[in-house]
Design a protein with these regions (language model features):
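Intrinsically disordered, low-structural-confidence terminal and linker regions
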Residues: 1-29
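Extended, charged low-complexity segments
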Residues: 6, 12, 272-301
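A short, N-terminal "cap"/entry segment at the start of jelly-roll beta-barrel domains
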Residues: 56-139
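Conserved short histidine dyad/triad with adjacent acidic residue
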Residues: 102-104, 137-160, 183-184, 239
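Short, conserved beta-strand element in jelly-roll/cupin
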Residues: 161-177, 181, 259
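Short beta-strand His + acidic residue motifs that chelate non-heme Fe in jelly-roll/DSBH
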Residues: 177-178, 237, 243-249
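Short acidic-glycine-tyrosine-enriched beta hairpin
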Residues: 181-239
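A short hydrophobic beta-strand segment most commonly corresponding to one strand
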Residues: 251-268
Length: 301
């Protein structure tokens, strides 16, 4: 059972673009307009129960609309639990998000290898302002993804910070999160600050090519904690705070729902890497069908 029992029409309207933006651009030609869907689902009412919405998604022959509804209900549950500090039933939300991905052709799902070596699938992106910024993704770690990336580069540039407050809920597996501090006034620096520059012409929701560019600021790193998180647990990262994540669940998968929000303040995003490197291009494999990974995760739940 989810905490969210109903969705009102204004919330639905506000969520339309952030949900649609999480799909590949071709999805725009498949999904009906906001006005059409609003009329179809609400039919003059101000609210609709999540049970009614899910029942509609189960019964309609329009798979693109079904995918949208499953994703909407799942994402709204994540946001509600985050903002109200409620326990997130990750299995319930997983079922909705998994359906949302499975029911449409894989080419309509944006999926790419993130800088930390996981498969990243956007689910919701609201980016009208920094203060109201909200970005939710599904992250999947699995050793089958190793062939799509340069593992040394992933390791070299895996310590990073975020502009926004981040929270990660573990769906399955065993996720590690190490935290770091640094000092720049040191004679024993081993690392440097890097700026990540994205190829602006590429997909704005999941970039798949970027450069880590040396900023001429050297630093000494200190690991301050090592954490391990399991299914039904979560961890949080404050803006500007350094961390490094990964998974410890081989040969099985690990998966998380990961969110950024601007409501907790704005920080600075940067990457720490070996100081002997001046510039490094990071290519991320795009359009990896996630279905086999969804199947694998289902067997773990």
């Amino acid at each position: 059972m989810t905490h969210i029992q109903k969705i009102d029409i204004s919330d639905f309207c506000d969520s339309y673009n952030p949900i649609v933006k999480s799909y590949a651009t071709e999805y725009l030609s498949k999904i009906d307009s906001l006005e059409s869907i609003k009329t179809l689902l609400f039919n003059g009412l101000n609210t609709k129960s999540t049970i009614e919405l899910i029942d509609f998604a189960d019964e309609t022959t329009d798979n693109y609309l079904s995918s949208f509804i499953y994703r909407l209900v799942g994402v709204k549950e994540i946001i509600f639990c985050r903002e109200n500090k409620k326990h997130l039933n990750t299995n319930e939300v997983w079922r909705l998000i998994s359906k949302s991905i499975r029911i449409i052709p894989s080419e309509l799902t944006i999926s790419s290898i993130g800088s930390q070596g996981f498969l990243s699938i956007p689910l919701y992106k609201k980016d009208l302002s920094l203060e109201t910024f909200d970005f939710i993704r599904l992250h999947i770690w699995d050793d089958s993804l190793d062939k799509f990336m340069d593992l040394k580069k992933c390791q070299d540039f895996s310590i990073h910070s975020h502009t926004f407050f981040a929270k990660s809920w573990i769906i399955t597996g065993k996720v590690k999160n190490d935290r770091y501090e640094y000092e720049t006034e040191s004679d024993f620096t081993t690392h440097s600050f890097f700026e990540v520059q994205y190829n602006k012409s590429l997909n704005e929701v999941n970039q798949h090519s970027s450069k880590a560019v040396y900023k001429n600021i050297n630093a000494r790193l200190f690991k301050t904690s090592e954490e391990v998180h399991f299914a039904k647990g979560y961890y949080e990262i404050e803006p500007s705070k350094l961390h490094q994540s990964g998974h410890l669940n081989l040969p099985n998968s690990s998966a998380t729902f990961f969110s950024f929000t601007g409501k907790e303040g704005i920080g600075e995003s940067f990457v720490i890497g070996p100081k002997e490197i001046v510039e490094s291009e990071i290519n991320r494999k795009m359009n990896i069908s996630p279905i086999y990974l969804l199947d694998k995760i289902d067997t773990q739940l």
